[in-house]
Design a protein with these regions (language model features):
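Short acidic-hydrophobic catalytic motif
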Residues: 1-151
Length: 151
């Protein structure tokens, strides 16, 4: 049953459907929001709100990295520099926000020393399934291309 849910998530092509699928209680959802996001896209705001970042959206558009589950924030870097390790055997995760070589802030979602990033400008999402103990999906929302979903 869980494998069917994972496959349905991977085949979802719009933010509304993906938002619904991410409510699976067996999912940890890692969300990286780059500084390039300005919050003008209403669909993106709804997506992030459903993912658990609604309170953060009230204080202007957030930048940082979050770990959420069922629309609740479990951990977050905040907008400043941070590095947080999260262990869920057999995996080890790191969410971090740091200054890059060009002085701009960069976000990273790392699992077992592999960095996951689909788009350079926008939102990156990594979905970990607690039952299968695998990364089940990863995608980006490219704000430089009309919030197109990139898998």
């Amino acid at each position: 049953r869980e494998m069917i849910a994972d496959q349905e998530l991977k085949e979802s092509g719009d933010m509304e459907t993906i938002s619904e699928k991410l409510q699976n209680p067996n999912y940890w959802v890692f969300i990286s929001v780059d500084d390039s996001c300005n919050g003008e896209d209403q669909e993106l705001q709804r997506f992030l709100g459903a993912a658990g970042l609604g309170d953060a959206l009230q204080n202007g558009f957030p930048a940082g990295v979050w770990l959420t589950s069922q629309g609740k924030i479990l951990n977050a870097t905040g907008a400043g520099t941070a590095k947080i390790y999260i262990r869920k055997k057999p995996k080890e995760f790191c969410i971090q926000r740091m200054a890059g070589a060009d002085g701009q802030m960069e976000n990273q979602i790392i699992c077992d020393r592999v960095s996951y990033r689909k788009v350079d400008s926008g939102v990156n999402v990594v979905v970990y399934d607690l039952m299968t103990e695998e990364i089940e999906d990863q995608f980006g929302i490219d704000v430089s291309d009309g919030c197109r979903i990139v898998r």
